[in-house]
Amino acid sequence: MSFSNKEQGKQQPALLPSAKAIDALVRAEHRDPFAILGPHGDGAGGQFIRAFLPGALSVQVLDRDQQQVLGSLQAGEVPGLFVGHFPEARPYLLRIQWAGGEQVSEDPYSFGPLLGEMDLYLFAEGNHRDLSSCLGAQLTTVDGIDGVRFAVWAPNARRVSVVGDFNIWDGRRHPMRLRHPSGVWELFIPRLQAGEAYKYEILGPQGILPLKADPMALATQLPPDTASRVAPPLTIDWQDQEWMLARGERQRVDAPLSIYELHAGSWQCEVDDLGEVARQYSWAELAERLIPYVKDLGFTHIELMPIMEHPFGGSWGYQPLSQFAPSARYGSPQDFAAFIDACHQAGIGVILDWVPAHFPTDTHGLAQFDGTALYEYGNPLEGFHQDWDTLIYNLGRTEVHGFMLASALHWLKHFHVDGLRVDAVASMLYRDYSRKAGEWVPNRHGGRENLEAIDFLRHLNDVVALEAPGALVIAEESTAWPGVSQRTDQGGLGFAYKWNMGWMHDSLHYIQQDPVYRAHHHNELSFGLVYAWSERFILPISHDEVVHGKHSLIDKMPGDRWQKFANLRAYLSFMWAHPGKKLLFMGCEFGQWREWNHDQQLDWYLLQYPEHRGVQQLVGDLNRLYRQYPPLHDQDDVPQGFQWLIGDDAINSVYAWLRWSKSGEPLLVVANFTPVPRQGYRVGVPVAGRWSELLNSDSQLYAGSNYGNGGEAFSEEQSSHGQALSLVLNLPPLAVLILRPDS
């Protein structure tokens, strides 16, 4: 059969498209392959069928239902292009003979448009609440045929193809259909199954691009491989109904919130005979080890450093490229969901670190995705982050706004995650963040605020409140931006909590001073109470404080070995008795000497030493006290929950305060930050009678010197510190006491 478009001067447009169209198809530059390929009516009840299958030896057409041969498609002058005419239009299969074997499948170009108009409208509007079930690779059934529907946003592309092992990564085989005006390309590939690796081959305005991973991928290959994978639907049999029903109450602002921050790949690992890391644990293996440990220590939540797929392990997850896919380093999405389910069944909440501020420049990722600045700002003064050599999301573009919003909801709704800690919020709020004059672009009002990011954060918090009731959204925000945790209808950003970076910097600076000089830094510990109720705060001792030459938490402490441990115990006790929710990074709970290294597990061998076991025991007891006694948690965010007794004894480096519950129950906290025991130190109290020691951080239980008050003290009718009564206490060296009245 000849495939000339002209025969004796007459055109045959029905059998063959124009030479120009065929040329574009062969060169993989045709914008509408469905206009050429697949079945096309002949106007008389029959159909023409065209298939472009480079490398195929022959193609037969079978009746889809009966499997009988209807005829063959003929090859002609254009290699790979097969066409045929059939007098009756009916559903069909293609039997394709390749050099390596035979393939029988439905024709991808025999299916109509797949995505609904409402899905496309909501996506373009930036308000699709379940985008991870719409775009990307979706296992689905079309006209009774199982397969995978691919959909990707690339509005400036001239052509997009799906490539993978299933088509030997040949972009000519599966070019996609463009859905105007959304800029979304789609294609259904029948009989494709879960687990297939794939990417997109994109012809941009300036030519072919490096193969791109799917921005909406639900699963990925194990790094350093970079392809996306077709993921099966999440089919976990959730057993956390009790947790989810009670979550809103558990995560109320007046409830205890004590967070154990960890990096999943370096908390514990399988090690070889030399003690070197042999492999990272899977989610199932982590659950077996981590959940009992966290539960025993009394933490209410864990916070995972980013587990979204990221190409570079040394970024700790803070440069993710797959905002919808858990990292393949630890298992499948199903495995991750099972891990969260297990945490919930044990009464432990799960918070994820989440990065909507920036993304890495890897060529297989989002950068110049369709040959243009699609996800990022086009102007480097807006779109390039100098500190991290990353690109900044253009959240002013509705599709990007909606992409990140959908990512947040994906984790909260599909995986039952209890909260998101939003990374690097300060870098989002300011256009001149870490930039010199002339290196940034003002907003439309001439100011430095990033109005698009502000709108996004407010919208995020409003939507999460509606779509994931009871979930927390927490801001890592290091500036004095007002109203971070204020409601959006009151002009705030709407976060549940803000990390108190000021408290962290001041308190760590103080505790690193030699006690001889602490009198000159006395206000550094008390200053945090000046603004403690301006936001709802979390007190963070995070991973950032134990890396990059900052020393581990215990190694920051001054003095000899005994003093270092005493300082650490006193600091942690001060933190747990201070207003604000708690966050502690892994390893700090037992005094690891080394800085954290993401390539090694924690130094668990240290727990053979009593001082390290003592710190661990103290953290467990602090958590139990914090959860048991309402004065330590139920008025964290209001000044009525705190009362200074002694804040000005700089000479002795002593502080004392009361914590009050909503019901009027007090606890007394007294801290001595010198190595000198203070005998007979008088402290005013509001209640007469016996006061029991709930905690002494110098107790022998924690490998301390056991100096103190024998577990109790009795009030005297002598006024002090604005109170009608007082206690005379022995203050242990470098220690904190917490006492409670018996009556």
Curated annotation (Swiss-Prot):
Alphabetized Pfam families for the sequence = Alpha-amylase, Alpha-amylase_C, CBM_48, GlgB_N
Q: What is its EC number?
A: 2.4.1.18
Q: Name one GO cellular component term.
A: cytosol
**GO MF annotations, alphabetized:** 1,4-alpha-glucan branching enzyme activity; cation binding; hydrolase activity, hydrolyzing O-glycosyl compounds
Is Glycosyltransferase one of the keywords? yes
Listed under catalytic activity are: Transfers a segment of a (1->4)-alpha-D-glucan chain to a primary hydroxy group in a similar glucan chain
Signal sequence residues: none
The pathway where this protein functions is: Glycan biosynthesis; glycogen biosynthesis
Q: Name one GO biological process term.
A: glycogen biosynthetic process
SMART domains assigned: Aamy
Record keywords, A-Z: Carbohydrate metabolism, Glycogen biosynthesis, Glycogen metabolism, Glycosyltransferase, Transferase
- The active site is formed by D423 (nucleophile), E476 (proton donor)
**Leading EC class:** transferase
Could you tell me what this protein does? Catalyzes the formation of the alpha-1,6-glucosidic linkages in glycogen by scission of a 1,4-alpha-linked oligosaccharide from growing alpha-1,4-glucan chains and the subsequent attachment of the oligosaccharide to the alpha-1,6 position.
Stated family: Belongs to the glycosyl hydrolase 13 family. GlgB subfamily.
Subunit details for this protein?
Answer: Monomer.
In its UniProt entry, what is this protein called? Answer: 1,4-alpha-glucan branching enzyme GlgB
